[in-house]
Amino acid sequence: MLDRCDRVQVAVIDRHKAAEGYRRIFGAETAREDSSRHLGAKRLILALGESEIELCEPDGAGRVGDHLAKWGESLMTAGYSTVDVAALERRLDQLGVTTAREGEQLYFGPPHTPGVPFVISPSTYRPRVGRASFLYETTNTLVSDWRTAAAIYSGLFGLDPSRFSKIGSHRFAYEGTLTLFDPPNRLDRIELSQVTGPDSAMGRFTARRGDSLYMAYVEVHDWPGVHAALMDSKSRWTPRGKDAATERDGGWVHPKELGGLLLGVSRTTVAWEWSGRKHLVAAPR
């Protein structure tokens, strides 16, 4: 029932300051500003490619303030879209999942998910803004068995396990699967990464938080522009290869640059290399 990974919500101290990195690196632009009683927040919503980044600054007591008090500035909510939010709400209700509605958005999360809070929005067309194309992934880091998590998400969202693609990394010490929604047409998925090494970055993260929401991924159609912005501004990031100056495929932007969001970046099609369809990867321009 899920269509796309269309947004993330990030808990920040100052929404306008947090927006600076997205503008500088990706050419993101303000889509709108509003407030959320459900979150207890003022929101600055950025257009990032076809997707949106909700920068949530506390506005009195509420979920955003609680998140900041416990974890500091960081990724708070994984956002996906569906063509029929009401139908998904009915499905979740039948499964005994506690949900909350605010406007067009549907919220739910633990204990019904393996540590990830979700916000579901209606699928809609948006023009691309800036150097990014779209978000396509949020990462659920796990101490528990990734197979159990995959079964949970399949049940909640009606996903087809035959479309999933198994993953693993010695470099980052995890194993798991990508719950691809519509391959090979789109990359959208939830990544399930079960930690295999306690000394890895994911291992240290899950030691503090357990099963949890870790990061997001964006595809960019203008990697040279993103790369130049990263290098020229001396932003903190890690290249996918060995040399930042000559990196051609992407990397990871440090949370300090993006108001607490660890954001993976990949040039057009390169993510298919680890998504089960290497033949779809086009050479860099």
What residues fall within each predicted segment?
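N-terminal beta-strand motif that seeds the catalytic metal site of vicinal oxygen chelate
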Residues: 1-19, 73-80, 121-157, 162, ...
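An N-terminus-focused feature that recognizes amino-terminal "leader" regions
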Residues: 1-62
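Vicinal oxygen chelate
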Residues: 4-13, 44-49, 54, 64-145, 173-194, ...
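Amphipathic alpha-helical segments
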Residues: 14-29, 88-95, 145-161, 226-234
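N-terminal strand-loop-strand beta-hairpin
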Residues: 30-48, 107-112, 166-181
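Serine-centered coil/turn micro-motif
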Residues: 61-65, 199-200, 270-272
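Aromatic-anchored, glycine/proline-accented short structural segments
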Residues: 146-196
